[in-house]
């Protein structure tokens, strides 16, 4: 598997988690929708499924890890940035095979692509603090 396949999986997962957060739809339905209606060429489908399912099933645990580092309530965080931070926190917590620098860098790049103007700074700040506490 090429690193770019995981990058594409993360990118698709951010979009799917964003959709799930806003719609409240069943995560299996969101997964099906994205796998059938999006271009999944070159995407690590297994990793996409793991990120999507992992964030959905461990949302409360992930949010507990994230919340201490927020300067505002979690429900006030931009939904795109929330999706990105949840994915990165999942990787940092449950995918020890993913180097923390990779997880953070990928999250920053996703925030630059999808987030608000300074969203990448917010994402970086949260994840740096999370890693520092857990190392």
UniProtKB/Swiss-Prot annotation:
Q: Which cysteines does the record link by disulfide bonds?
A: none
Query: Which residues belong to the signal peptide in this entry?
Result: none
Can you supply one Gene Ontology CC term for this chain's record? cytosol
The terms under GO molecular function for this entry are:
RNA binding
Question: What keywords tag this UniProt record?
Answer: RNA-binding, Transcription, Transcription antitermination, Transcription regulation
Q: Name one GO biological process term.
A: DNA-templated transcription termination
- Looking at the keywords, is Membrane present? no
Keyword Transcription regulation part of the UniProt annotation:
yes
Protein family membership: Belongs to the NusB family.
Function description: Involved in transcription antitermination. Required for transcription of ribosomal RNA (rRNA) genes. Binds specifically to the boxA antiterminator sequence of the ribosomal RNA (rrn) operons.
Task: Identify this protein by name.
Answer: Transcription antitermination protein NusB
Species in which this protein is naturally found: Shewanella halifaxensis (strain HAW-EB4)
